[in-house]
């Protein structure tokens, strides 16, 4: 691995150039997404590569659709970086004051989710969950035995604002090995070995939409585009899968799913495996799209995950609703 400081997304893109508006256009032309490039940076990978069907610029902004898409992507990258910085600063400040634990209510900083989940942290179950995590973290204060790190517990929500959500992929609980969990379902930081489930996801992506299989498993590029990568349980004890199940996390993430179902329309839910599919009862199928398949794990991928074509189908559904598709290429 190179020793130089890795570049972030912002290093690769210059400010969008102003173009002269066309008097004959009153709306944006259609765009389609294809391909992409990879870069870990500190938050996400490169923005979607957009193929514009016409070069006509918008009258009001003077920007091409490609420039608009790039600027919007970069805006949300910057926002997710700010949210991450706030969480990191709060954890660092608490440790400097001799506290190992930061209350959960201080780690969800994305305002759109706080508005979508009013009062959730004041409910009795949330207090019990917070007390449980405090005991776990204080007990293990001398070693990082709870994953992901505290500042990444709500990474999925802090990276994908509520009003940005257009696709949801539900996992079960975080990876329980050192350095793997980063608060996004199925995702691992760059440099970590690809788990079998994630490798199978990439294989299906390659077969379905032609994406090349990346060398890393950081899915934050998807998250910034509006793919909510949500685990049902958001923390886990080291080397003990499901150790934080039935402690209150399921109630919280069920509230997240219900808020999407009730307050939004046209979201595409990808439910892989029985555990995720049980969440379908929380989703209004008359307002949203639910795609189901086997889990991508090595044990079940051959029993219905491979050839499910969920990635192309999700984009087809989004485009039919006039919503920009996901650039799945990392």
UniProtKB/Swiss-Prot annotation:
Provide the transit peptide span: 1-49
Could you tell me the gene encoding this protein? UNG
The reaction(s) annotated as catalysed by this protein in its Swiss-Prot or TrEMBL entry are: Hydrolyzes single-stranded DNA or mismatched double-stranded DNA and polynucleotides, releasing free uracil
Entry's EC annotation: 3.2.2.27
Function description: Excises uracil residues from the DNA which can arise as a result of misincorporation of dUMP residues by DNA polymerase or due to deamination of cytosine. More active on U:G, U:T and U:C mispairs than on U:A pairs. Highly specific for uracil and no activity with 5-substituted uracil or cytosine derivatives. Required for initiation of base excision repair (BER) of uracil.
Tell me the compartments it is located in. Mitochondrion
The UniProt note on how this protein's activity is regulated states: Inhidited by the small peptide uracil-DNA-glycosylase inhibitor (Ugi).
The broad enzyme category this protein falls into is hydrolase
Annotated transmembrane regions:
none
Provide the protein name. Uracil-DNA glycosylase, mitochondrial
Please name the NCBIfam families in this protein's record.
PRK05254.1-1, PRK05254.1-2, PRK05254.1-4, PRK05254.1-5, ung
């Amino acid at each position: 691995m190179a020793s130089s400081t890795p570049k972030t997304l912002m290093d690769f893109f210059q400010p969008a150039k102003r173009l002269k508006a066309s008097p004959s256009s009153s709306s944006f032309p259609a765009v389609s997404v294809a391909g992409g490039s990879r870069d870990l940076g500190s938050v996400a990978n490169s923005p979607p590569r957009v193929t514009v069907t016409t070069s006509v610029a918008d009258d009001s902004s003077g920007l091409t659709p490609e420039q608009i898409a790039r600027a919007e992507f970069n805006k949300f990258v910057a926002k997710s970086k700010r949210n991450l910085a706030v969480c990191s600063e709060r954890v660092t400040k608490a440790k400097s004051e001799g506290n190992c634990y930061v209350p959960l209510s201080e780690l969800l900083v994305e305002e759109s989710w706080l508005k979508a989940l009013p009062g959730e942290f004041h409910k009795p179950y949330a207090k019990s969950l917070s007390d449980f995590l405090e005991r776990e973290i204080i007990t293990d204060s001398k070693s990082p035995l709870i994953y992901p790190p505290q500042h990444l517990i709500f990474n999925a929500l802090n990276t994908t604002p509520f009003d940005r959500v257009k696709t949801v992929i539900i996992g079960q609980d975080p990876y329980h090995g050192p350095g793997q969990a980063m608060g996004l379902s199925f995702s691992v930081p760059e440099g970590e070995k690809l788990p079998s489930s994630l490798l199978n996801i990439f294989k299906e992506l390659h077969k379905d939409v032609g994406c090349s299989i990346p060398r890393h498993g950081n899915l934050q590029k998807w998250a910034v585009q509006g793919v909510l990568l949500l685990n049902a349980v958001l923390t886990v004890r080291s080397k003990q899968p499901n150790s934080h199940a039935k402690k209150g996390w399921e109630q919280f993430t069920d509230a997240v799913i219900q808020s999407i179902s009730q307050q939004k329309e046209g979201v595409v839910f990808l439910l892989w495996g029985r555990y995720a599919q049980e969440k379908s009862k929380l989703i209004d199928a008359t307002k949203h799209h639910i795609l189901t398949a086997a889990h991508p794990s090595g044990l079940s991928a051959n029993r219905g995950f491979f050839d499910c074509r969920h990635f192309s189908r999700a984009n087809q559904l989004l485009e039919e609703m006039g919503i920009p598709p996901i650039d799945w290429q990392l």
